[in-house]
Amino acid sequence: MALNKRNINNIFYIFVTTHLILWTVVPTITNSNLPLDTIEALAWGSNLDWGFNKHPPLSAFFPEVFFQIFGPQDWAYYFLSQIFVVISFFIIFKLSQEILNDGTLSLLSVFLIEGIYFYNFTTPEFNVNVCQLPFWCLTVYYTWKIYNSKKIELYDCILLGAAAAFGILSKYLFIYLLVAIDLLFAYLIFFKKSKKFDFKYLVSLEVFFVILIP
């Protein structure tokens, strides 16, 4: 029987809820201590700065927020990590729907992502890799919207700039994705000439640098 849109959405919600609960409860029960990267993030968060020689500040900021709310409860930091993963699943699901225009294939896309090591077994350890996931997905999503749209929307450019900035504030190596995006649009505009330069592109850069200036 073919799946309708409502059934697909219900399956997706059941899946992400199951993932959230499973990967929060299991490490809470089985681990005697928090993972080392999470402990390190909590230590940095207690003396939060705009950046460290090893990592940017966001991977320390979010654990510190949860520490202020929940205190030294291990489950809270496993839960925090899964929130980031689940948000990524929502973005991937949305992006897949726009690209594939097929609900079943979009659902399968999320299932395939779940099978990747970095979206399951390593996710209880909140670190820069987990922290960057939703911002990476958002950056790709809004890049796709700008690339695929005949009329570029200003808010897409604003959100792209914000997602890219928060990505850099999550992990320094996020810059590789941004360089790849810049090279793609430079090629499309100046060499292939399949797209025209739009000053709205500069809005993304402005938002990006405004967020990073502090």
Question: Predicted segment positions?
Answer:
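Start-transfer (signal-anchor) and selected internal transmembrane alpha helices
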Residues: M1-W23, K200-F208
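Membrane-interface transmembrane helices that cradle and orient dolichyl/undecaprenyl
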Residues: Q97-L100, T139-D156
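Short acidic/glycine- and proline-prone juxtamembrane loop motifs at membrane-interface regions
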Residues: F121-Q132
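Extracytoplasmic catalytic/substrate-binding loops of multi-pass membrane glycan-assembly enzymes
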Residues: V26-A41, W50-V65, G71-A76
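Transmembrane alpha-helices of multi-pass, membrane-embedded glycan-processing enzymes
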Residues: P63-F67, L80-I91, Q132-F135
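Transmembrane-lumen/periplasm boundary regions of multi-pass, lipid-linked membrane glycan transferases
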Residues: F166, I175-P214
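Transmembrane-helix signature of polytopic, membrane-embedded enzymes
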Residues: N10-Y13, I92-G115, L133-P134
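Membrane-interface alpha helices of multi-pass inner-membrane proteins
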Residues: N47, D156-Y172
